Amino acid sequence: MRAIITVMGNDRTGIIAKVSGVLADIDVNILDITQTTMQGIFTMVMLVDISKCSVEFEAFAGILEQAGRDIGVVISAWHEDIFNSMHKI
């Protein structure tokens, strides 16, 4: 099972380190990642494998949201199938 994670906020040191550390703590593997900074705004999209995640999806999303608040960015997570259906034309 896979999920999509988005991260947005003012650029600062340690964003990728914090997010990847949180994912490692709950046994989530990063499959693909893209990130950029546009005029001081950090954006990142990750595709992750949640098949071995140590918590349920709702808790997973909540942990990421809290981590985002801790570092001043917005982090959202969706099941891959829901994300794909939301972004289908």
Stretches with model-predicted labels:
Residues 1-89:
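A conserved regulatory-domain signal marking ACT and ACT-like small-molecule sensing domains
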